[in-house]
From Swiss-Prot:
Cellular compartments annotated: Cytoplasm
Biased composition (Basic residues): 86-96
Family membership noted in the UniProt record: Belongs to the universal ribosomal protein uL29 family.
Source organism of the structure: Ophiophagus hannah (King cobra)
Gene of this entry: RPL35
Protein known as: Large ribosomal subunit protein uL29
Length: 123
C-alpha cells in the first residue's frame, strides 16, 4: 500500500477510516511475519511506511472526533476539561472582565457622594 496522505483521509467517513485502519493493521502483521521468516528487504522497509500510515489514520479519526465534540459543546455552560482552553492555573482562577468591573455598594455610594473635583484654570 502506498503512503497515505492526511488530506485524502479527511474527506472519508468514519466507517471507511476504520476499515482502512483494519487493512493497514493486517498488512503490518503480515510484514512483521515476513520480517521474522526472513523476507525481502523491500518488505522490511515497508513496515515503517505502514506504521506511519496507521498513525495518520488514527490522527484524522481523533481530530474529527474532537472537532465534532467542540461543535456539540459550543454554547453550552459546561464543557469537558479537554475541550476547555489550556491556560496556566493562575489564569484559570483569575476574575473575568465582568467580575473585575463589579463594585461594592459602599464603593458605589462613596463615588456618588464624593465625585472627583474639577478645577477651572484661569487663563
Amino acid at each position: 500500500m502506498a503512503k497515505i496522505k492526511a488530506r485524502d483521509l479527511r474527506g472519508k467517513k468514519k466507517e471507511e477510516l476504520l476499515k482502512q485502519l483494519d487493512d493497514l493493521k493486517v498488512e503490518l502483521s503480515q510484514l512483521r511475519v515476513a520480517k521474522v521468516t526472513g523476507g525481502a528487504a523491500s518488505k522490511l522497509s515497508k513496515i515503517r511506511v505502514v506504521r506511519k500510515s496507521i498513525a495518520r489514520v488514527l490522527t484524522v479519526i481523533n481530530q474529527t472526533q474532537k472537532e465534532n465534540l467542540r461543535k456539540f459543546y459550543k454554547g453550552k455552560k459546561y464543557k469537558p476539561l479537554d475541550l476547555r482552553p489550556k491556560k496556566t492555573r493562575a489564569m484559570r482562577r483569575r476574575l473575568n472582565k465582568h467580575e473585575e468591573g463589579l463594585k461594592t455598594k459602599k464603593q458605589q455610594r462613596k463615588e456618588r457622594l464624593y465625585p472627583p473635583r474639577k478645577y477651572a484654570v484661569k487663563a
